[in-house]
């Protein structure tokens, strides 16, 4: 039996690149309606064009800090994917806003989920909860070494989910996403990801900038794989559990930069600058066994293939935007 077939599902932050990709997969799996609650600060309506072609998508422009907006969005749905959050950089710049979104906003979602008898919540956490590694690879029992407000908010979210499960038997799973990349990344926002900045530089014939020695490592996971994990978490019997979502592969910024230059066909060399202190975690690599065992999920898009797909999407998106501006679309 397909538990998604014919259901109504809410995605907070659903116009973002993870939320919108999850919406695509939910509609492919037979969801009758996908609701999107998004304030469109980071999310983009373009990201939902594919989903709208697949099925019934209802977009509610609203903020998870607004209790009425959340309650109206949750009413009548079977499941909730809670993706709405702030970037780690924004949390550092605006601590009060971070608390309001990550804590108060999540509280609104959970309260409404209980009130309207939601069957399960699938929540976005982050590998940021781990901070600097005590050991590698990081499993789900790794200590919380986080020293960022964003990570603190995600730890609090996990504990809130656990408490609501204990108090109200609200089923949930939470995913500690590692370093997500892929189509629908923010290509023109204030806080563009390092990959997008590098692609912009390469396109302009300028060397991509690496801040620090380039030995900082991450575990990159393709957005389609992340969305598959989300869906797997919904349909699985697992509840009151957290899972890593990564490839289980450690990639340094140096390696990432040279791979991007390679797939871009560029002969440029990276340019090194003094390290910037925003998130100074030196290494990340996930263990993936728990998700494989309990959810049957394993990420399968390797980094080089994913980078090629990202570049193709970026070129297509820029072409479409240029055509729209030129009035030829």
What kind of region is each of these model predictions?
Residues 1-180, 301, 317-320, 327-329:
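N-terminal Rossmann-like NAD(P)+-binding domain of SDR-like oxidoreductases, especially those catalyzing
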Residues 22, 230-234, 257-260, 307-314:
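Hydrophobic "lid"/C-terminal helical patch
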Residues 54, 141, 168, 196-210, ...:
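A short C-terminal helix-loop "cap" of Rossmann-like NAD(P)-dependent dehydrogenase/epimerase domains
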Residues 69, 108-112, 220, 225-228, ...:
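Conserved mid-core alpha-helix of short-chain dehydrogenase/reductase
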Residues 80, 226, 230, 245, ...:
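Non-catalytic, hydrophobic alpha-helical segments
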Residues 155, 180-196, 206-207, 211, ...:
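Glycine/proline-rich active-site loop of Rossmann-fold NAD(P)-dependent oxidoreductases
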Residues 213, 242-243, 251-258, 265-283, ...:
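C-terminal "lid/loop" region of Rossmann-like NAD(P)-dependent oxidoreductases
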Residues 223, 276-298, 302, 309:
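Conserved C-terminal active-site "lid" loop/helix of NAD(P)H-dependent oxidoreductases
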